[in-house]
Amino acid sequence: MSTPALLVLADGSVFHGTSIGYEGSTSGEVVFNTSMTGYQEILTDPSYCKQIVTLTYPHIGNTGTNAEDEESRSVYAAGLIIRDLPLLHSNFRASESLHDYLVRNKTVAIADIDTRRLTTLLREKGAQGGAILTGADATIEKAQELIAAFGSMVGKDLAKEVSCTETYEWTEGEWALGKGFVTPDEQPYHVVAYDFGVKTNILRMLASRGCRLTVVPAQTSAEDVLALNPDGVFLSNGPGDPEPCTYAIKAVQKLIESGKPIFGICLGHQLISLAIGAKTLKMRFSHHGANHPVQDLDSGKVVITSQNHGFAVDADTLPANARITHKSLFDNTLQGIELTDKPVFCFQGHPEASPGPQDVGYLFDKFIGNMKAAKRA
């Protein structure tokens, strides 16, 4: 691995390093993630579509990769930036090195750069466009052309790009040491899950709590969902700007009116907010990491959460029937809401983690409780 690589940012910053993945070029929004582990889950999180991820922890790749840690069917991150790739990897579950994994998935990546300097730039100036090019003929001029062609994340409807194209069933539960992924004996709740870029651990955590899932494409109508007679509806995470997803906003409005229990995560949270008349905005400093403190305003407790979003809901635009349930202790941005007149609630972060803590896993239990109450009514 001695092929030179070049990273260029929209502000003109240039970093020279070494290619550690697929040979070629890529562009996207450059962000940083503070997670110390879980690089494979990050790479395969569809929410990172069109984003080049900088990992702030210096040594990445120590534990290799394996088939069980995939959060989707492929790598969705546009590229990877790290400080150091160890020569050796070691883990009892490892089946492949990170380098080989990146090459097989045609993911462009760069190492041997000062990620502390890069993170400081992104922290001070905010996420911005960037490009990685590999090979001796990589030039700053080519990188600038790629950055200009990419533009920004504003206005990009990426949910349609990462969503499944056909409806499928899911029953597999969470992973257990020595057992692998376990399917519960009983799954009394039927949940229709919208795939806007859903992570598999979300599906597994719902399945482990007794949910039989029907996963539907992003553009599925509310009428088609209600025809399946679900006990509840789940709105998944996903990439891009929520405002262009007018097809989803329209469907969510009708689903809310139906009175079905609804739970949304990440993009799903933003779509619920837009459906009830609130506004979203592009964050200058996006949230990406597994150590974000959030306050549960109902209990007063502080929970450590996994976060991955570049857009947020404007709390000042919420209607009267939406109450705020969670807020970020980093920047006070809105993290969760609940409707006072419908069994609908949502959370901006990732209760399923992967990677990260599961301090807010109780939100899955809340969803189960809402469905149980609805079945008794």
From Swiss-Prot:
Pathway: Amino-acid biosynthesis; L-arginine biosynthesis; carbamoyl phosphate from bicarbonate: step 1/1; Pyrimidine metabolism; UMP biosynthesis via de novo pathway; (S)-dihydroorotate from bicarbonate: step 1/3. PROSITE patterns: GATASE_TYPE_1 (PS51273). It catalyses: hydrogencarbonate + L-glutamine + 2 ATP + H2O = carbamoyl phosphate + L-glutamate + 2 ADP + phosphate + 2 H(+). SUPFAM superfamilies: Carbamoyl phosphate synthetase, small subunit N-terminal domain (SSF52021), Class I glutamine amidotransferase-like (SSF52317). The keyword Plastid does not apply. Transmembrane segments: none annotated. The active site is at residues 266, 350, 352. Residues 190-377 form the Glutamine amidotransferase type-1 domain. L-glutamine binds at residues 47, 238, 240, 267, 270, 308, 310-311. One of its GO terms (biological process) is glutamine metabolic process. Residues 1-186 are annotated as: CPSase. InterPro entries: Anth_synth/Amidotransfase, CarbamoylP_synth_ssu, CarbamoylP_synth_ssu_N, CarbP_synth_ssu_N_sf, Class_I_gatase-like, CPSase_GATase1, GATASE. The keyword NAD does not apply. One of its GO terms (molecular function) is glutaminase activity. Its EC number is 6.3.5.5. It is an enzyme of class 6 (ligase). Keywords: Amino-acid biosynthesis, Arginine biosynthesis, ATP-binding, Glutamine amidotransferase, Ligase, Nucleotide-binding, Pyrimidine biosynthesis. Small subunit of the glutamine-dependent carbamoyl phosphate synthetase (CPSase). CPSase catalyzes the formation of carbamoyl phosphate from the ammonia moiety of glutamine, carbonate, and phosphate donated by ATP, constituting the first step of 2 biosynthetic pathways, one leading to arginine and/or urea and the other to pyrimidine nucleotides. The small subunit (glutamine amidotransferase) binds and cleaves glutamine to supply the large subunit with the substrate ammonia. Belongs to the CarA family. Composed of two chains; the small (or glutamine) chain promotes the hydrolysis of glutamine to ammonia, which is used by the large (or ammonia) chain to synthesize carbamoyl phosphate. Tetramer of heterodimers (alpha,beta)4. This is Carbamoyl phosphate synthase small chain. It comes from Neisseria meningitidis serogroup B (strain ATCC BAA-335 / MC58). The gene is carA.
